[in-house]
């Protein structure tokens, strides 16, 4: 990937020679977090070693949580009750949906799993697929057909045919079409009826057990909404040992979610991937979190935990708004020990140098130019040095602020140009006067914006302390 296209931290986030790794990236709006996330995802997908999952819209899951909790949308920070188990559920949901898409494109990977592993995967998909695209039933049905051993279906069919045949013996005897010893007619019919009754009793017992397991599973899920009918169907059809995959009585919710996440990662590995890469971005664009620091903090804080960030086979990459930096900078000793971000990649502020922003600007000029390729330096007047332009861009530090400054600069300069200016005149070049005016105005706006963000962050830290 070209060096100009992404932030220098790209190389720290994409280690194609190692396994999945976690990272926490803070940046203000317009700093290029989403562009960096897209570049990281593109690099990981091109490498193909890991299953890459992007979560850029958390509202569908948060809406489920609000409904499950019975909270009104007007309640202040209705997400304070989110815990780590809920957020691992969200990860499992996003991962199972992405895995279903990947298996559609590469169905051969499913053949690498044993029948018991396919049954485990089927239950995970039935429980965690959020059905945002309406394809949950199709995926569960496909996995059910692939998870049930063919010999069991054949054996069940033969058992049913033999039972039905035994029950029909008296009718056949009365019709006189087949000669059967009268003394054997009743025992054969009773055996046939017993076989059918046994099948019916077994089916009823499996259905009741499935309903019981389904109720226990659904009661623990607050951020996903499993389809009860599909879950009962899966629990009824799959082997009896499959149900404990989802719930075990002796463990807490959080322990159970860690076990399920580790189980999914192992399934992913057994299908040929090195692990799971999960990229979370744009939480400040959530309509439910409303870009409120307290709501976003309630959503992210449970995830900043050493056990989760360092989970083997999981690369959790969080692209977070800079307002949440007090979660790290203002953390006390106990919280720092819990997070252990020294063992993960941490970008505490996504900033760009003047040279990097200049390269981005030059690339935009090339893309927008109909004539010969040009660069920003060629548009500056003789009294204006390129070093000064780099310094101005460096002070702004983000693509959004830098490009806003350049836009205002060219607009200001264009307003001063005379109508009769000759095409070949040097007057077209940006003057120092326009540069100084817009540099001062842009610097003031940037300082005001960052001061407001710092105040918001301080308020967050004060409330938490």
Listing of model-derived features with the role each one plays in the protein:
Residues 31, 35-270, 446-450, 463:
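P-loop NTPase nucleotide-binding core
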Residues 25:
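Hydrophobic anchor at the beta1->P-loop junction of P-loop NTPases
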Residues 57-61, 320-324, 417:
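Short beta-alpha junction loops
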Residues 78, 82-102, 351-396, 401-409:
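Conserved GTP-binding G-domain of TRAFAC-class P-loop NTPases and closely related GTPase folds
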Residues 2-20:
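Pre-Walker A adenine-sensing motif
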Residues 39-45, 52, 295-301, 408-411, ...:
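Amphipathic alpha-helical scaffolding segments
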Residues 130-143, 147, 155-160, 188-192, ...:
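C-terminal alpha-helical "lid" subdomain
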Residues 3, 28, 44, 212-386:
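The catalytic "switch" region of P-loop NTPases
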């Amino acid at each position: 990937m070209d060096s100009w296209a992404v932030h220098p931290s790209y190389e720290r986030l994409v280690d194609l020679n190692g396994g999945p790794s976690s990272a926490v990236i803070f940046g203000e709006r317009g700093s290029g977090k989403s562009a960096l996330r897209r570049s990281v995802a593109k690099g990981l997908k091109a490498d193909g070693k890991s299953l890459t999952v992007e979560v850029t819209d958390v509202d569908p899951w948060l809406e489920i949580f609000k409904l499950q909790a019975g909270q009104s949308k007007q309640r202040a920070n209705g997400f304070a009750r989110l815990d780590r188990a809920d957020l691992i559920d969200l990860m499992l949901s996003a991962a199972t949906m992405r895995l279903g898409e990947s298996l559609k494109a590469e169905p051969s990977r499913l053949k690498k799993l044993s029948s018991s592993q396919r049954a485990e995967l089927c239950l995970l998909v039935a429980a965690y697929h959020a059905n945002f695209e309406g394809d949950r039933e199709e995926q569960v049905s496909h996995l059910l057909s692939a998870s049930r051993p063919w010999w069991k279906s054949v054996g069940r069919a033969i058992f049913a045919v033999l039972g039905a045949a035994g029950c029909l013996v008296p009718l056949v005897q009365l019709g006189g079409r087949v000669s059967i010893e009268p003394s054997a007619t009743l025992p054969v019919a009773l055996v046939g009826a017993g076989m059918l009754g046994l099948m019916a009793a077994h089916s009823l017992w499996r259905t009741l057990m499935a309903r019981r397991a389904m109720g226990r599973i659904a009661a623990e899920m607050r951020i996903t909404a499993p389809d009860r009918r599909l879950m009962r169907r899966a629990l009824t059809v799959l082997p009896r040992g499959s149900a404990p995959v989802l719930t075990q009585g002796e463990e807490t919710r959080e322990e159970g979610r860690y076990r399920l996440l580790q189980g999914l990662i192992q399934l992913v590995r057994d299908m040929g991937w090195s692990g799971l890469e999960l990229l979370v971005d744009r939480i400040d664009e959530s309509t439910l979190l409303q870009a409120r620091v307290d709501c976003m903090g309630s959503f992210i804080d449970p995830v900043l935990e050493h056990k989760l960030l360092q989970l083997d086979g999981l690369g959790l990459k969080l692209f977070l708004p800079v307002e949440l930096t007090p979660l790290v900078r203002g953390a006390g000793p106990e919280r720092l020990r819990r997070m252990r971000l020294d063992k993960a990649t941490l970008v505490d502020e996504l900033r760009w140098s003047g040279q990097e922003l200049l390269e981005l600007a030059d690339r935009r000029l090339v893309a927008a130019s109909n004539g010969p390729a040009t660069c920003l330096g060629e548009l500056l007047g003789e009294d204006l040095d390129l070093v000064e332009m780099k310094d101005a861009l460096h002070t702004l530090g983000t693509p959004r602020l830098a490009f806003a400054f350049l836009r205002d600069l060219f607009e200001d300069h264009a307003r001063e140009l005379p109508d009769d200016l000759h095409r070949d005149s040097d007057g077209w070049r940006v003057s120092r006067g326009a540069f100084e005016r817009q540099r001062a105005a842009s610097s003031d706006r940037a300082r005001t914006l960052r001061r407001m963000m710092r105040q918001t962050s301080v308020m967050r830290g004060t409330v938490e302390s």
